Amino acid sequence: MLTFLIPTAKEMTIPKESHPHLLPQDSQAILKIMAAMTTEDLAKAYRIKEEAAKKEQQRWQDMASQKSLAYPAYQLFNGLMYRHIKRDKLTTQEQAYLTQQVYITSSFYGIIPANHPIAEHRHDFHTRIKIEGQSLKSYWRPCYNQFAKEHPQVISLLSSEFDDVFSKDCKQLWISPKFMAEKEGQFKTHSTISKKARGAFLTACMENNCQTVDSLKSLVFAGFYYHPDLSTDHEFVYIKKEA
């Protein structure tokens, strides 16, 4: 069975379905630090203006006082990649695929199933804090490595910020899809192409119930197709021709 890892997103939208917020044990230490920070501290940690930091401070304090509601993560996150993932009117098989084979990597919650209930928050591995004297990446590395050992065949749709959260020896069977546009024989890639394509790729995997590495090679989605000559065992390249 294939396991997919996808990143979080800064952009969020509140879905209809809500749950009580139950925070994993490993996240408690992070919450304690974040909830105690001033708006000035948060502005520095996030590299944002203090006005924007006030909103984040309220979110952390609401979590600490157990006032926060939680929402299925794949519905709450609404960045460009998420908007290109099929999230509504799923078949029973697609719903099972999304909730059993797709996991979200978070610097606050750890690695969670796509439908895990989470609260509104802003947090990533660039957030400037120390947890028990460690960087966020060092703090989460044992948890992330354990997940990798339990799920050896991972399809990673993660961005570069996650490259050194996992230890290298845990990623021997990983495959990272790469998405490129071709125009007049020239190949190019950029953030917008990649984010949209990640969502479309995951949707195609769900719709086709892909369970093997070879099945990924026959996918055609949003104009992209697998390019064997540019691909390697660990990087599958998908090309979309532009006019």
UniProtKB/Swiss-Prot annotation:
A Pfam family hit: H2O2_YaaD
Residues spanning the signal sequence: none
Domain of life of the source: Bacteria
Cellular component, GO, one term: cytosol
A Gene Ontology biological process term: response to hydroperoxide
InterPro entries: YaaA (IPR005583)
PANTHER family given in the database record: PEROXIDE STRESS RESISTANCE PROTEIN YAAA, PEROXIDE STRESS RESPONSE PROTEIN YAAA
Family: Belongs to the UPF0246 family.
Name recorded for this polypeptide: UPF0246 protein SpyM3_1790
Species assigned in the record: Streptococcus pyogenes serotype M3 (strain ATCC BAA-595 / MGAS315)
